Amino acid sequence: MKFTPRCVPLWLGLAVFPVIAIAPLARAAEQMQAYTFAQPSQPLTQALNAFSRATGQSVVYTLELPGVQAPALNGTFSAEQALQQLLGTSGLAWRRVDARTLTLEAVGTDGALSLQATTVTSQMDAYSYQPPASASIMRGQGPNQDIPQAINVVPAQVIRDQAPRNLDDALTHVSGITQGNNFGGTSDTVMKRGFGDNRDGSIMRDGMPIVQGRSLNANTERVEVLKGPASLLYGIQDPGGVINVVSKRPQLQQYNALTVRGSTYGSGKNGSGGGFDSTGALGDSPFAYRLIVDHEDEDYWRNFGVHRESLVAPSLAWLGEDTQVVLAYEHREFRYPFDRGTAFGSNGHPLGIPATRRLDEPFNDMQGRSDLYRLEVDHQLADDWKLHFGYSFNRETYDASQVRVTGVNEAKGTLTRSIDGTHNAMSRDQFATVSLAGNVELGGLQHDLLLGIDHEDRKVFRGDLIRQTAQSSFSYVNPVYGQEVEGSSVRASDSDQTDKLRTDALFMQDAVHLDDHWIVVAGARFQQFDQYAGRGRPFKANTDTSGQAWVPHAGIVYKVDDQLSFYGSYSESFKPNSSIAPLTGGVVLDASVAPEEGKSWELGAKLDMPGSLTGTLALFDITKRNVLVANFDSGTGETVYSNAGEVNSRGVELDLTGQLSERWSLIGSYAFTDAKVTKDPDLEGNRLQNVARHSGSLSAVYDFGSLFGADRLRLGAGARYVGERAGNATNTFDLPSYTVADAFATYETKLDEHNVRLQLNVKNLFDKVYYSSAVNQYFVAVGDARQVSLSSTLEF
């Protein structure tokens, strides 16, 4: 389907229709919002703290709570339903004072409430930067404090404040993250602890894999990161970690928001957009809907190019007491500039041209569409047991044209270029999972159990590959564009690029609570896989392999108290060696070539102060073995492939996010990452490409609170630092370090009793020229220039 902005009015019309039709019914519905809980059975005090973190309605009380064990709480409930279940037979009852205030009251022996002074005031700020106590990326394993791996969360309020343009933007305050080859600015490529590429399968949507090039959009609630090998839960992966983009879900409480946006890079490079978000109950039933519509149309910040993107995301949910079902669909159409950036000269420095000057042609872009279908079913089998089923199908298609730099003549100030393209590209992924989570007491010890089955079927296909030589050289000093036309010569030997992967897996984990302080965790995954890859007309298979693997995981946690814990863990990952491109000598990668294996040791500490700060300190050492290495045999003149390669990444990471006080919020991080090749005939000792040895960030927000009655003002600013990085695998040039600052301001007021929010964001405040990643010296990504954007949101 070709992108056309003419469909936007229709979509906006479709967006408004449900509000007109459903609002009268929704207003009659019970005014309650649904929250997702994953709390183990624990002392009532701890359970109420976790409840507050999940709902923003902290329970602060003056009476002495009975020393009882609250039941496990897993699933989706309103705050009232969840609190009722937690209180159980404690002898306490709840009473709501207002929308964010609850009161606990003792029930007398005669069943009457004791109305002695026990007022509960909400301590949890709706604008808090503190993340939830549990992350869905762990597939229902309980509080993050009990997990012997680093987990980072970019909370919903950070997303709202910083208005990230893509996943790279959203993760700037997570330690150990740098950008990799982002395919000309069209794909999310996140390097985690030194590992990752743009097809590594490490990005999830609601815990299920996706193939979309860009995964962050208006339907995003928050972003979660699990650091280190994650094959126990997510199968075939590099050992750096996985990322989970959590979607907004239907709510029973009626909410509508209409947003309009405007932006500028200066010099006439402007943009506009808008969005609509509506959710609520359908009549008096437990059904809830959500509809999100968004459109963006902006000029690219360099000398030509446009970015257009439209999103329609309807979803429907059944929110019963024991069973919750979510059915969601997401349709996206996009047009991106396909920009390979600038080039570096033989002196290891960028060419002496303005950062805005492109080295390609105006027809360099990518146009496509994607569709994502998702079904989730959660059923509470008993107080301590939850059954989960998930299914997703997602597909993306695109056509891309590009002019690529193939050489630089610095003496003449000219470039040689090729005219390339990809037509009829398609990626799809089908995934299904069933898991059971719960806890049981055996031998006097509590066991938190997780068992599951996964199935995945993924295909990446690139149809017609355009390859042809430019008609003439190009002056980068005095450029004249328009001398070339889009390529049309299909190279048969490069076309029909295909990569198929099918996997089936069984995983299990047991977390044993030895006492109130010690938790021992052990688990394993058994995975079978089939991978087939190749290219060409006629088709030539270059990978045809299958196999199976056991992947273990073990860890130990010592909880000093509810707020501080220490942990240690050992984890493994695996990833089959594969190649779409032909290998020298016609070698086919088969079952005789062992998969890459990652082994990681990690030590750390976690701080979690309800209503205040959440922090993680981690020390890690990851080794990836069986990396495919090409060895040229001078005697036979042939290249022999072996699993002799090895890389290592070790370092320290610190993350902190939350509230310093009622007025101050912050999110920040620091990482030291020493990543290098440890075994390779040519590259041994080299630093891994695009990985910074030092990186860090800090962003702070000051909330002025209520001004002029109900009005509210918040100001925030921050900066991120990324150190020097190797620009290629051979380490012949480096990308310089950089520091980039951002700022924002929000002002909230009332308009006829409706909330109105004005927000100003400034990206790259000081208009710093910087280089975010590189493929080689001819493809060096240039960071975006300063952008000023203003949005206005009306809630009704």
Q: Where are the language model's segments positioned?
A:
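Acidic/polar loop-and-plug regions of large Gram-negative outer-membrane beta-barrel proteins
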Residues: E296-Y300, A313-Q380, F393-S427, A470-D499, ...
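Membrane-embedded beta-barrel scaffold of Gram-negative outer-membrane proteins
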Residues: E376-S392, E396-R404, F566-Y567, P595-Q659, ...
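Acidic, small-polar-rich N-terminal luminal/periplasmic segments of exported/outer-membrane proteins
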Residues: R53, S58, A72, Q116-Q253, ...
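Outer-membrane beta-barrel translocator/receptor signature
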Residues: N219-E221, L232-P314, W318-Q324, D371, ...
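Surface-exposed extracellular loop regions of Gram-negative outer-membrane beta-barrel proteins
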Residues: E333-L351, D457-R462, D530, V557-E602, ...
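Structural signature of Gram-negative outer-membrane beta-barrels, strongest in the C-terminal barrel
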Residues: A313, A317-L319, S427, Q446-R458, ...
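Gram-negative outer-membrane beta-barrel transporters
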Residues: D621-T623, S642-N728
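Conserved C-terminal beta-signal and adjacent last beta-strands/turns
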Residues: L449, G568, Q689-F796
